[in-house]
């Protein structure tokens, strides 16, 4: 199964359980490096504790095994999204307007595939990004974005 569709399948399967624990499923990532891994990111308004990550790992891990959602050996990781969180859905970004983000595109825009800048706004079509090296912000459509993450600025 393709990694993107496996991540979606796992997301749909585990989200009700995670929500029943008072948490939010931030996203699911599937990697196939040296050892295949399923990484589940959870969040809440007050952040998440190590104990909450462990509880989700136990409960969700057991469910994934019993229901045989994944048909090969894998490592399960449960984590908070962290300070430099990846964005999995466009609607996650609206809470970070005014913050710096890092974006990688599927294909080039203005001769580049990577952008860093200040997120100025989001809407149903895409986002507006103010780059440090340009006066005018650029509009990037959601379907052009391959990866996006928050850049945490220490003060």
Swiss-Prot record:
Main location: cytoplasm
UniProt GO BP: ribosomal small subunit assembly; translation
Compartments it resides in: Cytoplasm
Gene Ontology cellular-component terms listed: cytosol
Keyword tags: Cytoplasm, Ribosome biogenesis
This protein's record includes keyword Cytoplasm: yes
Family of the protein in this entry: Belongs to the RimP family.
Annotated HAMAP family: RimP
Record PANTHER family: RIBOSOME MATURATION FACTOR RIMP (PTHR33867:SF1)
Function (record text): Required for maturation of 30S ribosomal subunits.
Protein name: Ribosome maturation factor RimP
Annotated organism of origin: Maridesulfovibrio salexigens (strain ATCC 14822 / DSM 2638 / NCIMB 8403 / VKM B-1763)
Gene coding for it: rimP
């Amino acid at each position: 199964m393709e990694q993107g569709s496996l991540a979606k399948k796992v997301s749909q399967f585990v989200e009700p359980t995670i929500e029943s624990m008072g948490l939010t499923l931030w996203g699911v990532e599937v990697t196939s490096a040296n050892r295949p891994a399923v990484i589940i990111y959870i969040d809440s308004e007050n952040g998440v504790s190590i104990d909450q990550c462990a509880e989700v790992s136990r409960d969700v891990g057991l469910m994934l095994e019993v229901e045989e959602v994944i048909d090969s050996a894998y490592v399960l990781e449960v984590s908070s999204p962290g300070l430099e969180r990846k964005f999995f859905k466009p609607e996650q970004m609206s809470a970070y307007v005014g913050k710096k983000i890092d974006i990688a595109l599927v294909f080039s825009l203005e001769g580049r595939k990577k952008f860093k800048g200040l997120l100025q706004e989001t809407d149903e079509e895409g986002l507006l990004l103010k780059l440090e090296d340009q006066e005018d912000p650029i509009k990037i459509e959601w379907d052009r974005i391959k990866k996006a993450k928050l850049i945490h600025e220490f003060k």
